Amino acid sequence: MKRILIFTALLAAVACENEIPYDFGEAGPKLMVTGFLYAGAAEQTVNVSLSEGGTVSGVGDATVRCYVNGTLAATASAHSDDKARAAHYHQLPVRFSADFDTGDVVVLEVEADGYKASTPELTVPHKPIVEKTDTTYTTVTHTDWSEEVLRFTVDMTDRKGEDNWYALNLVKEVTGTFSFEDGRPDIPVVRRSYPTISHSSLTDPILLDGNMALTDVDLDIMDYMDYLGDGRFETFSDQLFRDGPARLVFDSSRQYYYPGADSDYLFDLLIRSYGVGSDGFVPWPTSDEISLSVEVQVHGCSKDAYLYLRALHTVRSNGYNPVLTEPVTIPGNIIGGIGFVDVLNTSAVRIGLPEN
């Protein structure tokens, strides 16, 4: 059954420069800048678009300057390959490298098509304290149906003496090493994707805190694996385990974790990325070794990032009904434009999985 979701009033009170959506009818052209930066990552990415009236369009080019603690750390423009793809997706990714860690202050300045925007000062949060991560295959049984899932457990400890906010996601990585009988070198190809996370009051009260309260009867009616939407991130606060330990328990459908299902995709990627078969003849590899792993990522984030991700996840949820539900305000923090950018600090554990 549909439950009326009461979304936290904090969304309306979040201390940001603006909010999304804004009055499209009266707004002139503004840069839309979105993305998350990751402490310690080799490459950072933000997406740039142009919003005017009720439409969003791509930009021809964009330049991003990144300042860390007041010092220019990187200047980058969009790659030519990204420009070609941006014409279809109406957002242009700009990639750059910059090094920052806990406590550093990051500011981005963005220029595109004659428009300018910037972020406020973004303080890099602490990395979550994660002691142990584990997983096992199991079956979730309900009244009339069952589902094979990969069940994850994450043991972590809250940082003492402060309010903390977190985000959680999975990254599946399938790697294929292709060999050819004509003697050409082996080619490794990697596919990364973000499986949906599911949980209920039957598994984890921390991740469910502030979401819909579902019973087993509700889960029989709704789609268990998708009822919380298909957003990339789950979010949670330390409200239920402040200054102490916690164990997160969540599931992901086993259908995402069969490497054989990815082999055809990997070969298509091989053709597109490396020009194999560009002469009209596609030599099928004599062998391909497929390996599968999943990375569990727990991110430390700001309160604003927590509210932003929670809002996006809520409006994409199968349980969200704009007629029956309180309206959701999506925070924004871009100065001179719209959108949201913030910094995450990640604790990650990669787990190798069997092929079947």
Predicted regions and their residues:
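Positively charged n-region of N-terminal signal peptides that target proteins for export
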Residues: 1-4, 18
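A sequence/structural signal for flexible, mid-protein segments enriched
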Residues: 17-356
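C-terminal motif of bacterial Sec signal peptides marking the signal peptidase cleavage site
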Residues: 12-15
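Sec-dependent signal peptide hydrophobic core
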Residues: 5-9
